[in-house]
């Protein structure tokens, strides 16, 4: 029979606790602060004091700063353990509050198990789950039966989770989802710090904002400021572009992203790519800058055009993109190679400008014509070397094929003679215009002070007839398979065909001749300078993978 022994129980328990503390060192005994009544049922609950609510007096148990309130509690003094149910409230100071239907508590191990509509309340957020484990010695609370975290704006769910009370940190595992009005996050594993609003990701993770999408398998993210860094297969989907790299950085407020090591910026609309080892992207200005072995890949003639420079800058929307290359520009295509100090590519008009850095006053004074020509932009078509002060290449944007070529100022075409060991066919003039058909250079017009040296052979026996040395106002040249097959001179050409022996060796090259075959890229690797090839990728400090969720199961 239940008796109202409230005050008697308190006195007995307090005395018992004092004697126990004096008698032995170790875990403190659970204290009974109040109860509406007490009884025992040794058959069903051997060794238990059954504490119950009566007349609005609920059961209050205290253990080392933790207060547990309930309607009924089965207290086992010898085990320093109790089970409680009925509107259970567990509080630890003013920092932690748990409400649930049932709770078990081991005072020796300081372990609690709460289940049934569990709610863990903090000043900054609340956790709801079906079953919650609380380890007071390690200041941890964890669940593995699906949980929901709520704050003022954000809802977070996961199958498993652990809360590090001292660190004010949550770790969520398996099917992690964060739903915020401004972004959504899904992850395999996520660590979240409540004071800094910062999240760390481990495993496949995606972040979807209003104007961006991010994927990574390691990373960190400030959920308040919407900025973070991302590693391991990281991708930012941003303004019709994909940004990839070993390490990515992103700031939503600044419309800014950066990438380090093995980066690629892919324009998904025009299918162009820029690679390198460092890049910055500015969404508001619709621009990107890439350095460290930077290389752009564009489609021309249904073929890849590779462009390398110390620095590449892309600006404008996809349909009007401008690509600029600065310093030591080199280009490679299956039927075309090139080199210049700088490059300007307009993807809406299909115009490529290859330019040089102007010579200084001193260089203009002391350089020979050959030395000046060595600094000019240069192209190689087949066996032909073409150079000049400026080179313009234009593509037909409808069929994506090369359409025309223009070389402005000091235009040169040099071709190693196919039979002579030392001879070069040369054409020099002020302006060069070339036409393409189906991507092949078929016609060239050269005007203004045109000079020619050309080795002539018999059609049948391929015997050298002589060397043609001519000056004229202009000429037209027909090519096939990137080789000169016919030349027509215009406006009172002045020249003669001389036997090889009658033309001195020092007169077999036009003034300013400079053969640059050793600069010609043979493959994509040749696009990079020796400095580029020596470049070492700087290691990135990886985010450390955390320890397993639980090393041991909870008993």
List PLM regions with ranges.
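Bacterial Sec-dependent N-terminal signal peptides
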Residues: 1-28, 555
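N-terminal amphipathic/hydrophobic interface segments
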Residues: 23-555
């Amino acid at each position: 029979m239940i008796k109202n022994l409230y005050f008697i129980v308190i006195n007995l328990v307090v005395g018992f606790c004092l004697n126990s503390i004096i008698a032995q060192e170790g875990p403190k005994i659970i204290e009974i602060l109040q109860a509406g009544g007490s009884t025992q049922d040794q058959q069903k609950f051997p060794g238990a004091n059954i504490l119950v609510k009566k007349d609005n007096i609920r059961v209050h148990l205290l253990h080392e700063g933790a207060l547990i309130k309930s309607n009924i509690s089965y207290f086992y003094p010898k085990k320093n353990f109790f089970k409680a149910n009925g509107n259970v409230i567990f509080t630890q100071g003013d920092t932690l509050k748990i409400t649930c239907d049932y709770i078990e508590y081991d005072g020796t191990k300081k372990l609690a198990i709460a289940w049934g509509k569990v709610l863990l309340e903090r000043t900054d957020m609340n956790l709801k789950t079906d079953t919650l484990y609380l380890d007071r010695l390690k200041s941890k609370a964890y669940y593995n039966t699906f949980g929901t975290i709520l704050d003022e704006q954000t809802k977070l769910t996961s199958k498993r989770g652990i809360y590090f009370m001292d660190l004010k940190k949550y770790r969520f595992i398996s099917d992690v989802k964060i739903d915020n009005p401004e972004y959504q996050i899904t992850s395999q594993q996520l660590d979240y710090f409540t004071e800094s609003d910062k999240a760390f990701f481990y495993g496949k993770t995606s972040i979807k904002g209003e104007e961006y999408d991010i994927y990574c398998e390691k990373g960190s993210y400030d959920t308040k400021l919407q900025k973070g860094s991302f590693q391991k297969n990281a991708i930012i989907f941003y303004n019709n572009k994909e940004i990839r790299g070993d390490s990515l950085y992103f700031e939503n407020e600044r419309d800014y992203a950066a990438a380090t090591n093995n980066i690629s910026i892919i324009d998904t609309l025009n299918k162009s790519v820029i690679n390198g080892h460092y890049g910055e992207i500015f969404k508001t200005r619709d621009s990107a800058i890439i350095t460290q072995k930077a290389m752009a890949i564009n489609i021309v003639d249904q073929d890849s055009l590779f462009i390398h420079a110390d620095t590449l800058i892309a600006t404008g929307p996809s349909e009007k993109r401008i690509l600029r290359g600065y310093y030591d520009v080199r280009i490679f295509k299956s039927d075309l190679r090139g080199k210049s100090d700088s490059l300007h590519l307009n993807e809406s008009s299909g115009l490529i400008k290859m330019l040089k850095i102007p010579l200084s006053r001193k260089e203009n004074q002391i350089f020979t014509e050959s030395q000046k020509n060595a600094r000019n932009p240069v192209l190689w078509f087949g066996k032909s070397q073409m150079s000049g002060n400026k080179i313009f290449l234009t593509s037909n944007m409808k069929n994506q094929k090369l359409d025309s070529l223009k070389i402005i100022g000091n235009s040169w075409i040099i071709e190693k003679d196919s039979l002579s060991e030392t001879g070069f066919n040369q054409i020099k003039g002020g302006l060069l215009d070339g036409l393409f058909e189906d991507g092949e250079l078929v016609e060239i017009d050269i005007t203004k002070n045109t000079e020619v040296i050309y080795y002539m052979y018999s059609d049948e026996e391929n015997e050298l007839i002589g060397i043609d040395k001519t000056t004229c106002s202009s000429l037209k040249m027909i090519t096939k398979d990137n080789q000169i097959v016919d030349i027509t001179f215009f406006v009172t050409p002045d020249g003669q065909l001389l036997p090889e022996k009658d033309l001195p060796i020092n007169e077999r090259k036009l003034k300013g001749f400079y053969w640059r075959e050793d600069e010609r890229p043979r493959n994509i690797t040749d696009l990079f300078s020796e400095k580029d090839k020596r470049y070492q990728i700087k290691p990135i400090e990886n985010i450390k993978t955390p320890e397993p969720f639980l090393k041991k199961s909870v008993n």
